[in-house]
């Protein structure tokens, strides 16, 4: 049972992990006050009335905000945010952020989002502080229980429906705040204590959502009348839907471990809950829509198969485009959808518009720079791709190692005279990568580790730098860019020409320690181009060459399992579904300890989910 209503759970300056340590040493009588169940308590709050305008709240005012006003102003702040009025949204919520649970949730969410986007340590600290305040505010509204009531709850689940409406909303807000604080805990520092603290927050949030879902079912069964039931329902749908969806994406071996400690994830159920939430009229309905959009336009591509439900994405986005035609976030999703359809020119135009419509949050610009860089890579407009990679290196702190590697990789695709015109030193850039890697939750980012390993070729023990073969196209493959390029025959044909030129150049070079690895990389990329051009027999020959060279590879051992993944898709496209599944399972079960292993396992999990049973995803 989730910790619901315990003041011990959140004191002024303590978090879940510290509370857990305190709980270990408490006596049984003290434990009874922890309230591990929803229990019947008679205390009901007096109505909080909005005594003054939130924007003009006098210092020290004792005026209170009722649930209705909190929901309305939080919804208004969301509209301001989607209209690029980020500061206005914060200023609307700030005066009541320590009095109203929804003002606290909305205000801290915007501060946290800013922290995640900037990756500045000061912003991260501000986000943690804001979220700690928000948790304290939500705690004020949660169920309070006496020792007797808590003891009785150990014998029975109690009457869930006897929570007041305000207390139910407090649980949802508290769970949302916990999740966001966990995310910041992971990026704050790399020590194990923070990792454990973040994990405990996520588990507590998950348990609260499960309990809120039980409350929702009780209310629906008993047909209880509540003024803001649809808002509570929207919060439950958003939380449980997102949890189910995200957990279902994890590789099978991780899911088995999480199920052992009480987690479970069902993709179809998660999408259903989010769709139900999106179709409602609650404040969180837009957030349910945006979560599904993120799944279709990003997650399905990077951690999935690349098979995207563009039709649903367009349908969900349409009302937002009408209401917020110049909203940065909405334009960004619009551009992503156009890109996934293969409309690279339209996507470019929309990303540029996304940049031009606001200057308040430069972080949205960085997202667009990233996308524009990839579009130019797809088109092999290397100087333009270099321009955006350089902007990212200078302005964004998200992943310096990745940005610098990509900048060097793009430059290495250019003729030497054009590189000289940029006054950049490609070898020097590659050598910088190792010193720029970072750690989150105590772990290096997989894409940064990959970039560091590839860049080592330029810093060999002998002191004589080697040279990577088509590193920009290799990174494009890693980010599943061939799925996007596959929508355009002209782009696929142009890429095939480039790959075949590299193949010919390799054949004319002296044999080195890297020759087999480079040859297999070229064969993998060539096979992907041929697969996109619907030339399956030639593609299969390329893929088989990589698999047959497995024992000869010295460095890039990731090539074989990733090639098996591509081979499985080739078989599936030819109707050989059983053969495809068998190859996927071989890739999953027979290989380990290679670069980007987790990313491939995510993709295999997504493919098996789609292929083993009918799906409406």
From Swiss-Prot:
Q: Which InterPro entries match?
A: Iml2/TPR_39, TPR-like_helical_dom_sf, TPR_rpt
- Which superkingdom, per the lineage? Eukaryota
Q: Where are the TPR repeats?
A: 328-361, 520-553, 561-594
What's this protein's function? Regulates high density lipoprotein (HDL) cholesterol metabolism by promoting the ubiquitination and degradation of the oxysterols receptors LXR (NR1H2 and NR1H3).
Species of the source: Mus musculus (Mouse)
Q: Is Transferase included in the keywords of this UniProt record?
A: no
Tissue specificity: High expression in lung and spleen. Low lower expression in liver and small intestine. Weak expression in heart, brain, kidney, adipose, and adrenal gland.
Name the Gene Ontology biological process terms. cholesterol homeostasis; lipid metabolic process; negative regulation of cholesterol storage; regulation of cholesterol efflux; regulation of cholesterol metabolic process
Q: What happens when the gene is disrupted?
A: Chow-fed deficient mice display increased HDL-cholesterol level, accompanied by increased ABCA1 and MYLIP expression, increased oxysterols receptors LXR (NR1H3 and NR1H2) protein level without change in NR1H2/3 mRNA levels. Many NR1H2/3 targets are up-regulated, including ABCG5/8, SCD1, ELOVL5, INSIG2 and LPCAT3. Deficiency of TTC39B reduced processing of SREBP1 a pivotal regulator of lipogenesis.
Q: What is this protein called?
A: Tetratricopeptide repeat protein 39B
Q: Which UniProt keywords apply?
A: Lipid metabolism, Repeat, TPR repeat, Ubl conjugation pathway
Family under the similarity heading: Belongs to the TTC39 family.
Listed Pfam families: Iml2-TPR_39 (PF10300), TPR_6 (PF13174)
